[in-house]
């Protein structure tokens, strides 16, 4: 009985190690979950939508592009993550209602799809590239809205 017990414990430990070796790199470097909070991206996303964020593309393949939905660390409080759409690229000048923003070489202009109720670059200015975590890739929840997110 004692050897069966330890054999069972060893199987659990092996399973845990395999999970760590496979899941942790994926979670840290390739993709991560994100739950939408608030209404700034309505009608595209609603509060409570569960997304998978692609962290690989912007780190190894290419830079963000106009129209892509990204998740990033809020510049005024990096412990918070926001989701917005890229509306301006590095080096561009953005003019909205007579107010102008000149973007630096590593700055992006982001806005929520719900323009009237979004805290975004219009409020706090350009988003530094270093704050971008990744792009929205897949919506998993709610099940009725399960979809790949076109860019």
Name what the model sees in each region.
Residues 40, 93, 114, 127, ...:
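Gly/Ser/Thr-rich beta-alpha loop segments that engage phosphate groups in nucleotides
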Residues 118-123:
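Active-site loop architecture of trypsin-fold serine endopeptidases
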Residues 83-86:
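Short beta-strand-centered aromatic/proline hotspots
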Residues 90-96, 141:
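Short, conserved beta-turn/loop elements at beta-strand boundaries and strand-helix junctions
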Residues 94-105:
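Acidic loop->beta-strand submotif enriched in PP2C/PPM serine/threonine phosphatases
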Residues 1-81, 101, 130-131, 135-151:
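Protein maturation boundaries and topogenic segments
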Residues 49, 65-69, 92, 107, ...:
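Structural motif
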């Amino acid at each position: 009985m004692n050897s069966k017990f330890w054999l069972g414990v060893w199987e659990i430990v092996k399973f845990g190690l395999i999970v760590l070796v496979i899941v942790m790199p994926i979670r840290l470097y390739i993709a991560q979950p994100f739950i939408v909070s608030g209404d700034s991206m309505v009608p595209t996303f609603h509060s409570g939508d569960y997304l998978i964020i692609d962290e690989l593309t912007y780190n190894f393949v290419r830079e963000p592009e106009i129209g892509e939905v990204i998740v990033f660390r809020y510049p005024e409080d990096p412990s918070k993550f926001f989701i917005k759409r890229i509306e301006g690229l590095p080096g561009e000048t953005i003019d909205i209602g007579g107010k102008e923003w000149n973007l630096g070489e590593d700055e992006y202009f982001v806005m929520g799809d719900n323009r009237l109720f979004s805290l975004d670059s219009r409020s706090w200015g350009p988003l530094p590239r270093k704050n971008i975590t990744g792009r929205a890739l897949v919506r998993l929840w709610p099940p009725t809205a399960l979809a790949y997110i076109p860019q």
